[in-house]
């Protein structure tokens, strides 16, 4: 009994050490931004985005507190085989008060198994909700290839000249499909599940320092038995992507060409949309018909121009041509140079211009935005974070058209459609004006 008692403290110490090591193995990653800002004409900070554009230049132009908190752990490993559990919860509030309650968004919960298939060494099999191989332009916070959602797949299959990945994911739209109720009436209240099937071949070395990635995505509305879609709904569509990445000037340049059809044109990033309604209880949806095509040509990157200068840049042309004439032509160009005074202090400027033409009216909306920021960051790279910055932003815009959201889809035949700025004596779009803002912000990823 004495021997047992003497051994007990040692056993407890060993168990505590093992538990401590296991706890330390938890990976904590994430992203966050928050700050305070004012508008020159009074009030809290306003943010500026061109009507019809799918994004905005973000430096000194973000008006919310946003965070993604990721917890993950390798829960099993034997040789080169392993299982990894990953989660991600996101939050967003208006940053106007001390206490701002919000419901979290459960963005990720998945398990990834590596090297589980003997005859596919290096591959990963996965299932669950996941950010899946997302492609974006950081300076405008624009995701041009992103099929994230609940899904499953097999990725990084070595085919000799590249890596092959296969995946299926899902997103849903409110309304848009119906079941027969009574009195020959269809009640369009059921959510429509949209499936996306993704095939991509990446890491193909085609020139010194350059790689090519090709992808095909097919999206379709997946109805329950005995349900039907709203008449004119976009049932399915395709997205084709080619991206060349070149290592250059201690950074990279990406040149991207994408072509989409029908339901894959709305967001243009790989998620199917067009079978559902945009607002609850709108039986006759204004945007169910996304039939048409989209062409996107994009070039963006980040480079180093010597010891003291870094720069991000983007140039993009996007043409969404819909059969219902409610599409847009959007082109944007911008730069973000950074001068490093010391390894942890820099001055950053962002200049961006957007121009969006309405397919329906032929009118154009345009905006240019300039931000100057003094920044302190954890390192001497334009990608170094965390960063604390003070900024001043000036924006000027001239908008000739806007979207008509007066009334509802039942009473307004133009609901959700592009109309001239002075349509029916109204005031659509943001008109011709300018504004400036100033403030401070922190941004971090880890």
UniProtKB/Swiss-Prot annotation:
As one GO molecular function, the record gives: maltose transporting porin activity
- The answer, when asked if 4Fe-4S is one of the entry's keywords, is no
Classify the source by domain of life: Bacteria
What GO cellular-component annotations does this UniProt entry give? cell outer membrane; pore complex
User: Where along the sequence does the record put site: Important in sugar transport?
Assistant: 143
Give one GO biological process term: monoatomic ion transport
- What keyword terms does UniProt attach to this protein? Cell outer membrane, Ion transport, Membrane, Porin, Signal, Sugar transport, Transmembrane, Transmembrane beta strand, Transport
Which reaction equations make up its catalytic activity?
Answer: beta-maltose(in) = beta-maltose(out)
| Topological category with respect to the lipid bilayer | Multi-pass membrane protein
Q: What residue range is the signal peptide? A: 1-25
Q: In this record, what's one Pfam family?
A: LamB
Disulfide bridge partners, by residue number: none
Subcellular locations according to the entry: Cell outer membrane
Residues the record annotates as the site (Greasy slide, important in sugar transport) are: 31, 66, 99, 252, 383, 445
Gene induction: By maltose.
Q: What is its main location?
A: membrane
Q: What is the recorded function of this protein according to its Swiss-Prot or TrEMBL entry? A: Involved in the transport of maltose and maltodextrins.
**Subunit annotation:** Homotrimer formed of three 18-stranded antiparallel beta-barrels, containing three independent channels.
Q: Which family does it belong to?
A: Belongs to the porin LamB (TC 1.B.3) family.
Record protein name field? Maltoporin
Organism listed in the record: Escherichia coli (strain SMS-3-5 / SECEC)
Gene name of the encoded protein = lamB
């Amino acid at each position: 009994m004495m021997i047992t008692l003497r051994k007990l403290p040692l056993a407890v110490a060993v168990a505590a050490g093992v538990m401590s090591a296991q706890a330390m193995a938890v990976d904590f990653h994430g992203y966050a931004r928050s700050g305070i800002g004012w508008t020159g004409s009074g009030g809290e900070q306003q943010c500026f985005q061109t009507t019809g554009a799918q994004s905005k230049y973000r430096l000194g132009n973000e008006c919310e507190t946003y965070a993604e908190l990721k917890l993950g752990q390798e829960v099993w490993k034997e040789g080169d085989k392993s299982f990894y559990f990953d989660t991600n919860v996101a939050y967003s509030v208006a940053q106007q008060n001390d206490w701002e309650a919000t419901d979290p968004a459960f963005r990720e919960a998945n398990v990834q198994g590596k090297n589980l298939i003997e005859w596919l060494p290096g591959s990963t099999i996965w299932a669950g909700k996941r950010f899946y191989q997302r492609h974006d332009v950081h300076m405008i916070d624009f995701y041009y290839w992103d099929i994230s959602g609940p899904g499953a797949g097999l990725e990084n299959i070595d085919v000799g000249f590249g890596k092959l990945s296969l995946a299926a994911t899902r997103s849903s739209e409110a309304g848009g499909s119906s079941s027969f109720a009574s009195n020959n009436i269809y009640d369009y209240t059921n959510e429509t599940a949209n499936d996306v099937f993704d095939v991509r071949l990446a890491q193909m070395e085609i020139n010194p320092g350059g790689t090519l990635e090709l992808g095909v995505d097919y999206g379709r509305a997946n109805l329950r038995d005995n349900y039907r879609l709203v008449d004119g709904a976009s049932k399915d569509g395709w997205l084709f992507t080619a991206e060349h990445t070149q290592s250059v000037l201690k950074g990279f340049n990406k040149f991207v060409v994408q072509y989409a059809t029908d339901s894959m044109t709305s967001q243009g990033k790989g998620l199917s949309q067009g079978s559902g309604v945009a607002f609850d209880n709108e039986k006759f949806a204004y945007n169910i018909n996304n039939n048409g095509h989209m062409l996107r040509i994009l070039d963006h990157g980040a480079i180093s121009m010597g010891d003291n200068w870094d720069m991000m840049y983007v140039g993009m042309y996007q043409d969404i041509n819909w059969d219902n004439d409610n599409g847009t032509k959007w082109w944007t160009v911008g730069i973000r140079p950074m001068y490093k005074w010391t390894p942890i202090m820099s001055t950053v400027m962002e200049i961006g211009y957007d121009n969006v033409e309405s397919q329906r009216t032929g009118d154009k909306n345009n905006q240019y935005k300039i931000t100057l920021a003094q920044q302190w960051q954890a390192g001497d790279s334009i990608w170094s974070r965390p960063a604390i910055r003070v900024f001043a932003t000036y924006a000027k815009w001239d908008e000739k058209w806007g979207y008509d959201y007066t009334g509802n889809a039942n009473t307004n035949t133009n609901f959700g459609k592009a109309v001239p700025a002075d349509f029916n004596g109204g005031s659509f779009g943001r008109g011709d004006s300018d504004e400036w803002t100033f403030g401070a912000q922190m941004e971090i990823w880890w």
